[in-house]
Amino acid sequence: MLPPGADTVVVRHGDVGVKSSHVQSDMERTLRENLAAMLADRTVPGDVDREWGRILVRTPEPDRAADAAADTFGVVSASPAASVSPDLDAITDALADAAEEQYHEGAFAVDARRAGSHDFDSRDVNRAGGDAVWAAVEDDFEPEVDLDDPDLTFSVEVRDEEAFVFLETRDGPGGMPLGTQKPLVALLSGGIDSPVAAWQAMKRGAPVVPLYLDLGDYGGPDHLARAEESVRKLDAYAPNRDLDLRVAPAGDAVGRLAESVGRTRMLSYRRFMYRVAEHVAESVGAVGVVTGEAVGQKSSQTTANLGVVDRATQLPVHRPLLTWDKQDIVQAARDIGTYRDSTIEVGCNRLAPSQPLTAAPIESVRKDEPDALFEWAREAAAAVESTEVTLA
């Protein structure tokens, strides 16, 4: 819902504002660059500036620009607004115009916030603005005022040299601007969890290098396509970064594990997987690995077994979904657009033993797994191919 004359998007950021002044300046610059890239990626005209303590997008298409801002990491919220002179008459005129165009029924409220030096305060804006809205609609409707639960809120932000009138605020993802942290290798399985974990890492500012292990006969025929689709969806949140999917051949190693390892087979596979990711991370300058594992979701993801697989790599393994319930992961996947049919069998289930250990001693795992396991991982990483994933 846009006010008449909307020409600006007021962008608010969260965690950026709690940093030291130097760090905040760097993060705001990165956020502005990411916003500009997001606008360009969606062919939305606009200029991104920092004025009056806010990041502002000046644009002839505020509706589309607000949507773009609301998909940018580091943005808490975005409001398409009309910019007016910061005097009471201009503000009340803009509120009256907005009421005439957008008010149709129900209760309304005026919510003003002010910063800077003016000859009025926020309460003056609320009173005068409320009167202006009422006068604009009382002949055609039966308006009501409800400050606690209005059907429509007329919002005003007043700054030293400008005021903004807006009727809605769109939530952004929050977090940190993408690129303010070092990159991580994101292990993607083609399932639901791993893209959500990658998205969460991106939300905290870490670019991701997507890595998919091709399980050969042990993987479903559509798993690579599902991983590619996940990367395509993630790429929409990172317009100034190339999220090419790297594919490591793992079919031979998995086949050997299936033939030679019993109840600890899945742990050895995950140790192999982590070591492949470590080699890829070294080659691309990533500083860690991010996975979609959650405590207790599978036998290999108990607190004891996670400790066993962690010992296969010297890199930190980040698990954003560690304590999430499955239904929350599914909902997050739907929200960010990476959800795929959860009833489709995940290929590595065929690798799982019938009676896996839930607390395998590291000594037993090492004893049972092939001596050449980590050499296979090195070979798989050396054979990685990069697949360019383009937006549909």
What are these regions (language model features)?
Residues 1-185, 199-219, 224-226, 230-241:
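RNA-binding accessory domains that recognize and position tRNA/RNA substrates
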Residues 61, 191-192:
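Short beta->alpha connector loops
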Residues 9-10, 34, 140-144, 150-186, ...:
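Nucleotide-activated chemistry modules centered on ATP-dependent adenylation/adenylyltransferase
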